[in-house]
Amino acid sequence: MIASLVSSKEKTSWVTNKVMISYKLDWKKNPSFWNMWAQRSLKQALQLQELNKNVAKNIILFLGDGMGIPTVTAARILKGQLSGQSGEEFQMEMDKFPYVALSKTYNTDAQVPDSAGTATAYLCGVKANEGTLGLSAAAVRSQCNTTQGNEVTSILKWAKDAGKSVGIVTTTRINHATPSAAYAHCADRDWFSDNEMPPEAVDAGCKDIARQLFENIPEIDVIMGGGRKYMFPMDTPDVEYPTEKQHFGTRKDGRNLVREWKERMKEKRAHYVWNKKELLSLNPSKADYILGLFEPSDLPYNLERNKETDPSLTEMVDVALKILKKNPNGFFLLVEGGRIDHGHHDGKAKQALHETVEMDRAIGRAGLLTSTHETLTVVTADHSHVFNFGGYTRRGNNIFGLAPMMSDIDQKPFTSILYGNGPGFKLIDGLRENVSTVDYQQNNYQAQSAVPLRFETHGGEDVAVFSKGPMAHLLHGVQEQNYIPHVMAYAACVGQNHEHCGSSSSSAVSPRPSPATTAISTLAAALTLAWLHC
């Protein structure tokens, strides 16, 4: 029946128009809608039998810090609702990737991991202890003398050594856990500058993370994020907040790492920028290196961002890709939506989910600027959070709204979104707070939690790995987290995997979809649109 409906352009056009005219029909009650939608998905799955085995010229890794599967689902609903839909049926950009795997996130010494040990896994290819960066599990957190000899390198370095351009873009400080594992070897993730290090570690010769950013891999092509204060001598006023002492420079060694970078790069087409105007005024064709430090510490939440002075993650990714893709040898780019994690730790689900939506926009922008023929794109998380939503809510319920029921214990309402622990635990006269008396829709509302903690914790369940492009099919099943960079390296012929590279570049990629498949996709999309207008 499907084939007869879509056997020609004319019939497809006729059916599509008829669907649009009849959009008031309640398609969710019509079995044809679900059958056609499933058939479209089946056709797309059958196309995947022709695997893309090209060598990946480019690799992009999008890392949503703390972006567990419940966060992905809730952000999908939010993004759909922001576009006027009920939300559940919406497709995120990452949802469109053809391959999905699960990643086991534990650290070598932790069932529920931290972001440093996990970053070492998905960037360097080895599991590590919590709190350590770019070191094997033989290193012990905060013990400087366990650093030397236990260093492990990252896929960013493997790509750089292979002649590719490399970049890091993050919404956190550039020396935070996720980006740091790409270039640093540090026994403690909190050694942001020498000011945060114990004197004995400095005396023993261990380097702070900010210093390693510029010394370990001296010519990272693109660096964008926050963390300005860690680059300047102690008590140096910040360029943007010159009267606020909490933003002054922190370095005890007196070094000005930004000035040193500018001096070292003066013969190259290199630019230092610290605000949105400077970033967007750059001509990527005339810039080969960029150091962008947009805040003294982390960048603001996207909901609180000054759109005149602070670049969005999407804007940073856009500029980064336009610079990196000029290299005929290709590039590696790490992009972190880092403040998803911070929103969850603060119990501020609205902030966390809007950060996830913004990262998804950046994924979409990257897709427009690259080709799946030559670019492997991977989207994943380092860990989850004890965040969830439930309560038998109806279709289209505001994701930040109330469940349609009262507690049968205390007879009070509750929000659909809840945390297992965190700062949202509140008692009024010894009883649970009545959420109907507060503004639970405001940006910084802290959702209720079962256990009181100053900061909500990570979760220990597996996280999703979405992939598309060359060799994306290798990211399948349930895998250890450290498997991810091995696949990326294999796809790009960097690091230790070279034996397959001679013939891969001529391998076939997925063919263009057939006219019938295209017609089914068009029809299913039209049915969806009609349904959404019901």
Task: Describe each model-derived feature in a short phrase.
Residues M1-L5, P413, S507, T518:
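Intrinsic disorder/low-complexity segments
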Residues M1-V19, L529-C534:
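N-terminal signal peptide
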Residues W14-K18, Y23-S41, N52-K57, M67-T73, ...:
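A post-motif C-terminal structural segment
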Residues A45-L46, L51-A75, Y122, K127-A138, ...:
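Mobile, glycine-rich extracellular loop/lid and propeptide segments
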Residues R141-Q143:
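Short, contiguous strand/loop micro-motifs
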Residues E499-S521:
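C-terminal GPI-anchoring signal of eukaryotic secretory precursors
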Residues A519-A530:
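Disordered regulatory segments flanking catalytic cores
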